[in-house]
Amino acid sequence: MEQLIPLVNQLQDLVYNTIGSDFLDLPSIVVVGSQSCGKSSVLENIVGKDFLPRGTGIVTRRPLILQLINLKRKTKNNHDEESTSDNNSEETSAAGETGSLEGIEEDSDEIEDYAEFLHIPDTKFTDMNKVRAEIENETLRVAGANKGINKLPINLKIYSTRVLNLTLIDLPGLTKIPVGDQPTDIEAQTRSLIMEYISRPNSIILAVSPANFDIVNSEGLKLARSVDPKGKRTIGVLTKLDLMDQGTNAMDILSGRVYPLKLGFVATVNRSQSDIVSHKSMRDALQSERSFFEHHPAYRTIKDRCGTPYLAKTLSNLLVSHIRERLPDIKARLSTLISQTQQQLNNYGDFKLSDQSQRGIILLQAMNRFANTFIASIDGNSSNIPTKELSGGARLYSIFNNVFTTALNSIDPLQNLSTVDIRTAILNSTGSRATLFLSEMAFDILVKPQLNLLAAPCHQCVELVYEELMKICHYSGDSDISHFPKLQTALVETVSDLLRENLTPTYSFVESLIAIQSAYINTNHPDFLGVQGAMAVVLSRKEQNRLMLSQENDEPISSALDTVKPDGIELYSSDPDTSVKSITNKATNEITTLKSDDSAKMQPLDVLASKRYNNAFSTETAERKTFLSYVFGANNATRKAMSIDKSSSYPLNDSLSGGDTNHKNNHPLKMTDLSNEVETMALEDMSEREEVEVDLIKELITSYFNLTRKIIIDQVPKVIMHLLVNASKDAIQNRLVSKLYREDFFDTLLIEDENVKSEREKCERLLSVYNQANKIISTVF
């Protein structure tokens, strides 16, 4: 197991040199403590070299990963004596390590010590003053000159015959008050950096505390307790024991009675400031430390467990044991990282774009996946079906059966069509003649504009389906296609062009459907209500209204249909078994009689005008023969009388000849007055016959509109599916191949996105690092 620490060193070099952070949480010993507590002196004593920067205020401003590597040494007998980094026996290692720290024999051929920095790996430093200068320069380069700190570590390796294999991480000392141009939050920055390292489960905390201060105020122990409350991975170091007050000692602390730690405390005596100024050598400093513990009355009994050599040996053994304990977990974590990174790399795709034939295959596969995804989304066979909202073909179904149907059903068949409009159309369709029957021309004139109301929802339905297909097109690319932005854009544009091409005939066909319905009004359609059905509805409604009115007025209820002509023919019977059809049949037999009645009632215009002026209501009542006469044509005098209703007091011949005949108000009749009478003729209060005509037209329009609406609701989705949706599905594959599969397009379309390319290369680097780390661990585990 002697190679465990070098193994961790290799892993540290690997991860910091490639990734820049310890993603494996490698076992390490982290040195923490307050500013000027003696951390630097402890490290220099362990190394046996004076190499760390010194000064006032905060000096260590970046983490220093210090890797101590023991070099083999040769004796005069030319025997290779292996360094005692990780011996199987603690007794053997103790003797060897003590010798390593205290120097070598005078008769040995000393090997020159040297240092290396990870950021300049090809440079060896044999002068420790230059090492100190490089640490200062590198700190200044990254952390700046304002005494601020930086999390990027400095990796330093020291090769020496006087050291044990050991790795330590020196962190900035915790300071309370910023001095000079230090940031005002320097304490928070330092604390955050320290917590980042000591909170890792695989780190051993080396808490340095000065013995000449109360241990309960130790910042290092306070920080350690915050992450290791039971003290299982904290080892305490007491410095400056030689500076304690006379008559006092630290035996209670060293024995664990004051502040118990599982790993215990180790006492050290470092060089004082005067020793540093006088350039006291490390060998002399270690000799003075050993002499102090041997002759001190309180510490002489535990001298074997005090001093820098014992601390180095303890830390080395502790680190080896910690590595051995954590190595299986590290290997398992590494295996997980390799698997995850490999999966992530697979998601980015392993494209061999250098091979021209492979480029063609990649392009064809991308087009096939795009087309298949587009079709599957419409058919509902997509592998990624969302559960939170409708998508693909389900949205098309919703458009047809919810949006489109609701829009059509919400249209009023008589929208924008007033009673005056209907009456005017009826009058205009009859021309200058009186009407005998209900005008079919008026029905045609009125119903065609109403059918055109169906066009707008149909057009909107086509547009909505087109928009949904465009959305499906934009979401049809998979992760592999997204790696090539230009290819994805070309695929979307090609399919968009196809959809636009299919949109035009679809739009035209839907317009033709509306035009077809307006081109021929099929009143013989079996679902059309017809005149008889419309008459039944109108009469039924009038009867219901009459009954309701009679009940409100408490009048005797007698059927309004019990009307008998003067000749004794009963047209309307109160018998409920009498149908509208029988009534109509009776009415057709009377048409000849009605015509003769009309002839008999023809009178000169002036007489009619006089009669209407003198007794309009009695005349109107007298002219009513039967209710059917209002539908199939009464006497012609009714229409003629209405045409001169407003001007009945003016003899027409006198008015036109400029006579002096005046109205009862003595206003002369003018041509403009006659014109106004003609324009407002349709606005007059309608007779009962005219009301029936209007109601019949309304019922017929409503019936035919509903009939046409059902046809449109059924046919428009079929047209859209055939000409737009299915046509696009059938043609998408051939269109993509014919437009994009060209060798001169390969270089243009298969250009990877820079971000994707960068991420894939990063994954490849990570995977390489993980595999190398796994290979390193496999050498010993």
From Swiss-Prot:
Catalysed transformations (reactions): GTP + H2O = GDP + phosphate + H(+)
Please list the residues that bind GTP.
33-40, 170-174, 239-242
One cellular-component annotation, GO: membrane
- Region annotated G4 motif sits at 239-242
Major place of residence: cytoplasm
Q: Topology relative to the membrane, per the entry?
A: Peripheral membrane protein
Which compartments is it annotated to reside in? Cytoplasm; Mitochondrion outer membrane
Which keywords describe this protein according to UniProt?
Answer: Cytoplasm, GTP-binding, Hydrolase, Membrane, Mitochondrion, Mitochondrion outer membrane, Motor protein, Nucleotide-binding, Peroxisome biogenesis
Is-annotated flag, keyword Ribonucleoprotein?
no
Nucleotide-binding as UniProt keyword: yes
> Which residue ranges does the record annotate as region G5 motif?
269-272
Spell out the residue ranges making up region: G2 motif. 59-61
Region Disordered, annotated ranges: 76-103
Q: Where is the GED domain?
A: 694-781
Residue ranges annotated for the Dynamin-type G domain, each copy included: 23-328
Query: What EC number(s) has UniProt assigned to this enzyme?
Result: 3.6.5.5
What Gene Ontology terms describe what this protein does at the molecular function level? GTP binding; GTPase activity; membrane scission GTPase motor activity; microtubule binding
Residues annotated as region G1 motif? 33-40
Residue ranges for the region (G3 motif) are: 170-173
InterPro entries under this entry? Dynamin, Dynamin_GTPase, Dynamin_GTPase_CS, Dynamin_N, Dynamin_stalk, G_DYNAMIN_dom, GED, GED_dom
The protein's job, in short, is: Microtubule-associated force-producing protein that mediates mitochondrial fission during interphasic growth and at cell division. Fission of mitochondria occurs in many cell types and constitutes an important step in mitochondria morphology, which is balanced between fusion and fission. With vps1, acts redundantly in peroxisome biogenesis, which is under cell cycle control.
The record's similarity note reads: Belongs to the TRAFAC class dynamin-like GTPase superfamily. Dynamin/Fzo/YdjA family.
Q: What is this protein called?
A: Dynamin-related protein dnm1
Species annotation: Schizosaccharomyces pombe (strain 972 / ATCC 24843)
Organism taxonomic ancestry:
Eukaryota, Fungi, Dikarya, Ascomycota, Taphrinomycotina
